[in-house]
From Swiss-Prot:
<feature type="domain" description="SAM-dependent MTase C5-type">
    <location>
        <begin position="5"/>
        <end position="366"/>
    </location>
</feature>
<comment type="similarity">
    <text>Belongs to the class I-like SAM-binding methyltransferase superfamily. C5-methyltransferase family.</text>
</comment>
<dbReference type="InterPro" id="IPR050390">
    <property type="entry name" value="C5-Methyltransferase"/>
</dbReference>
<dbReference type="GO" id="GO:0009307">
    <property type="term" value="P:DNA restriction-modification system"/>
</dbReference>
<dbReference type="Pfam" id="PF00145">
    <property type="entry name" value="DNA_methylase"/>
</dbReference>
<protein>
    <recommendedName>
        <fullName>Putative type II methyltransferase M.MjaORF1200P</fullName>
        <ecNumber>2.1.1.37</ecNumber>
    </recommendedName>
</protein>
<dbReference type="GO" id="GO:0003677">
    <property type="term" value="F:DNA binding"/>
</dbReference>
<dbReference type="GO" id="GO:0044027">
    <property type="term" value="P:negative regulation of gene expression via chromosomal CpG island methylation"/>
</dbReference>
<keyword id="KW-0680">Restriction system</keyword>
<keyword id="KW-0489">Methyltransferase</keyword>
<keyword id="KW-0808">Transferase</keyword>
<feature type="active site">
    <location>
        <position position="133"/>
    </location>
</feature>
<dbReference type="InterPro" id="IPR029063">
    <property type="entry name" value="SAM-dependent_MTases_sf"/>
</dbReference>
<dbReference type="GO" id="GO:0003886">
    <property type="term" value="F:DNA (cytosine-5-)-methyltransferase activity"/>
</dbReference>
<dbReference type="GO" id="GO:0032259">
    <property type="term" value="P:methylation"/>
</dbReference>
<keyword id="KW-0238">DNA-binding</keyword>
<dbReference type="InterPro" id="IPR001525">
    <property type="entry name" value="C5_MeTfrase"/>
</dbReference>
Length: 366
């Protein structure tokens, strides 16, 4: 009998970080996510149940409705829903055996004792998670100028401390916290916080998703109590990732077309590969938006409010095409409206990268 390694995902989003771990044979016990659409996406993909907190120590099961591009759901699933999910592959041999608790609430209101009630006597091997990066990213023109204010003063930046709090209470064998490279500006403070909860070794592992088969560029830092240096793989181009979707109909979930803003429609045919309609100023760099992708190159970094134009067609990428750029399998679904789906995808960890990290951790825990 194979014993599955067990993990918790804090700030789980739609499940990109968890997807890589599940594909590598890990079992999610609990996931916490404030956004309702993202929480439903997570439950949908990993056969979970969604709870919300009604008072200290007491939770209720949520009844949710969802939409994933071609199929409406109610929760829990009815027989026809389950048949469709099995046919698509969302409920496959790995996921149908899972039953994570998805807490749809503010992590600041969740105590480790409440998490322990859900997991009962199961031991948590790993805690993963990606606290929001807005407080640290150079793309945010309003981030605090003093790096330490980003960690200790900024409301969003302080969520890193909530991650550390729960890690300290549950004491997993390994923790992995994802964020933008800007978080290294408070490296000393974060190391101090982790050492205070019992983790002497703290590594800031900088990884590029494209080094592990992801079709878009993404450089992120993974703070952990182990060194993470996965074996690199062959890069994949935009057209290799999304080319076949030009010939697939709407039976592919989340493959719905979003309209280009009216001001771009008459000019879109003139936009060359790699060019953008607009540029916006971050804290320390200029970023393009509505970018025509080059078919034979990597896509630029996928973000929640960043849109791409198809290399050969004068339209925006669909959420499914955008998900392919983050190496999601087509059986991973995104619940909610089309804008919500774009946001969920852009704010997640690319699956190819999360899977590479999971392999390193699995080897470490042997």
């Amino acid at each position: 009998m194979v014993i599955m390694l067990k993990f918790i995902d804090l700030f789980c989003g739609c499940g990109g970080f968890s997807r890589g771990f599940v594909e590598e044979g890990f079992e999610p016990l609990v996931a916490i996510e404030l956004n309702e659409d993202a929480a439903f996406s997570y439950a949908l993909n990993f056969n979970g149940q969604i709870y919300e907190k009604i008072r200290p120590g007491e939770f209720k099961l949520k009844e949710l409705k969802g939409y994933v591009g071609i199929y409406p759901f109610k929760f829990p699933f009815e027989e026809e829903d389950i048949k469709w999910l099995k046919r698509l592959g969302t409920l496959n041999e790995k996921t149908k055996k899972l039953s994570p608790v998805v807490i749809n609430d503010d992590i600041r209101e969740i105590h480790a004792i409440e998490i322990e009630k859900f997991i009962k006597n199961k031991k948590v091997d790993v805690i993963i998670g990606g606290p929001p990066c807005e407080g640290y990213t150079g793309a945010n023109p309003k981030r605090e100028k003093n790096p330490y204010d980003r960690l200790y003063k900024d409301e969003t930046g302080r969520l890193v401390l909530e991650y550390i709090r729960i890690v300290g209470d549950l004491q997993p064998k390994i923790f992995v916290m994802e964020n933008v490279p800007g978080i290294k500006e408070v490296r000393g403070a974060i190391i101090k916080e982790f050492r205070e909860i019992g983790y002497e070794d703290v590594y800031f592992n900088t990884l590029r998703a494209e080094d592990y088969g992801n079709p878009s560029v993404r450089r992120r830092v993974f703070v952990s109590n182990i060194e993470i240096n996965p074996e690199k793989t062959q890069p994949k181009t935009v057209i290799e990732a999304i080319g076949d979707l030009m010939y697939k109909g709407r039976d592919v979930p989340n493959h719905e077309f979003a309209a280009l803003p009216a001001r771009f429609r008459k000019r879109v045919h003139k936009l060359g590969w790699g060019d953008a309609f607009i540029y916006f100023k971050g804290a320390n760099r200029r970023l393009g938006n509505y970018i025509r992708l080059h078919p034979l190159k990597l896509a630029e970094t996928v973000m929640g409010k960043r849109f791409f134009i198809h290399p050969y067609e004068d339209r925006l990428l669909t959420p499914r095409e955008q998900a392919r750029l983050m190496s999601y399998p087509d059986y991973h679904l995104f619940a909610g409206g089309i804008r919500s789906c774009y946001n969920q995808i852009g704010e997640s960890v690319p699956v190819a990268l999360s899977r590479a990290i999971a392999r390193v951790i699995k080897e470490n825990l042997k």
